[in-house]
């Protein structure tokens, strides 16, 4: 959540940031500024009434002790109390109204994020490893998976519906091996391995920004205040929800393997075959909580950790800087890692590493104490990596002419 003070102190900057994102609010932002201004005035008035009430209460106590006449003071206290209660209710309602409006405004765009309308305006930063030249036409992963008996798409539909899969046999062993390899690499790079619930309450999804704006994208448990997590970013970040961290304990670096659940609202017709876009998938996530001065360096650290895994698996990939129009809701700056898929003859996203600055920390009340002062931390998140998409890339890049799959040396010890 952005700081409401910014709307009063630097309204034009906030408006420009939303314009960069193509986030239309019409005159809603101006109205919100007016509401915040009115709220501030009422808050000052409320504080004045509270101070007056305290002052008169003390006078009342002194006169009572002296057994003096207190009838006038009593009337004054009762009259002021009515005003105080009415104004307190008004201030509380305004605060709720402001917080609701602020909760659906996306993060401010980082100055390092280039201006652009959509993914077409994203900028390639660098390529790592050269794509292999095949002497045969490479197949797509779903063809290879079915040929080798690794993935049963029909059973996934039977058990649930479309966009679910069953992984079995040697394919399941590879899938498990990838998870272990990812966790080991992340742990080596200083990230603590954590296992968390796959269900969270509404407050946690608000903290990381999925709610209230993206309610259609998550699965809710009927008659419960519980949701299936769309990513371990939610659980790892919110481990420190409403927490004050000693500055000596920063940075906090965490990694988790979890199932992830997404409704994929708005994805009809996209990636209908295979494992690229599923309602349920596994992901190994990285989350970091840092001092504001250290978040840029942490983003580079997280990118390197994810890239190291891809290099170990001999998978060509590239870094792509997302433009302002393609940023996620909570992100201030995002760099994607896209892996080469020869079967599709293109690069596809396998990781997004985002710096949210203090946006999530303000929503989730994640603070740190430095020099006896509480400050908002910075939070970052990124995949390291999406397991299904890594398996897709492994099959397509390491396929042989007969349809068999070469296993990279780094993965052998996990099989």
Swiss-Prot record:
Binding site for L-serine: 231-233, 285, 383
Keywords assigned by UniProt, alphabetized: Aminoacyl-tRNA synthetase, ATP-binding, Cytoplasm, Ligase, Nucleotide-binding, Protein biosynthesis
Locations listed in the record: Cytoplasm
Involved pathway(s): Aminoacyl-tRNA biosynthesis; selenocysteinyl-tRNA(Sec) biosynthesis; L-seryl-tRNA(Sec) from L-serine and tRNA(Sec): step 1/1
Entry keyword Transmembrane: no
Positions of ATP binding: 262-264, 349-352
EC number in record: 6.1.1.11
GO biological process, alphabetically ordered: selenocysteine biosynthetic process; seryl-tRNA aminoacylation
Domain free text: Consists of two distinct domains, a catalytic core and a N-terminal extension that is involved in tRNA binding.
Subunit structure: Homodimer. The tRNA molecule binds across the dimer.
Entry's family note: Belongs to the class-II aminoacyl-tRNA synthetase family. Type-1 seryl-tRNA synthetase subfamily.
Function: Catalyzes the attachment of serine to tRNA(Ser). Is also able to aminoacylate tRNA(Sec) with serine, to form the misacylated tRNA L-seryl-tRNA(Sec), which will be further converted into selenocysteinyl-tRNA(Sec).
Protein name: Serine--tRNA ligase
Species in which this protein is naturally found: Helicobacter pylori (strain P12)
